[in-house]
Amino acid sequence: AHADELVSSVSAMQAVCQIAPYVDERSLVIAMDWLTCANPDLRVCTHDELSDYIRSAPRFIGSAKCRKALRLSKPGTDSPQETVLRLESDAYGLPEAHVNYEIIDHIRGSGTMKVDIAYPDDRVCIEYDGNYHYTHGRWMYDLDKRNRLRDLGFTPFVATREHLASKQKLNELFGMVARAIASHRY
């Protein structure tokens, strides 16, 4: 027999469903967001395809958990940290966050800027800065982008792994975001 006859595999969607009984809800949402990520080279399926797969699958251990995680999942997320930030934002009680939101730079007429998390009606956004953002070139790009966002009337905030590692720091950040949203509304 050939090797390909001896080895079987499952689809990525099936694999994510199979891990459901063994991982927490957040990890399952992160995995689902990864399947439907923004990067077309990494995206495995659309959110609708994932939804159809989970709905049409025969009942399995973890199927209820998968359906709940699917409701919390959002297509177009670029990183696990963005997913965690979005889920924590929801848990804090902030308005629904838009992921990888494109903001048109109508002042310069130079296209769009994508932000990790946005509350567009309130002109507030959050960027997650991982280690990738700490090269000189990327740092300068990020500074210019945030200045341009302010010029367009947005209030940008920055989250780091330190925020995700500390409930206190995360609550402080979300408190600032909530105040910025409130000041825009009233």
Where are these regions (language model features)?
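Surface segments flanking catalytic/ligand-binding clefts of nucleic-acid enzymes
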Residues: 39-186
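Short gly/ser-rich loop at a beta-strand->alpha-helix junction or flexible surface loop bordering the NTP-binding
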Residues: 1-61, 183-186
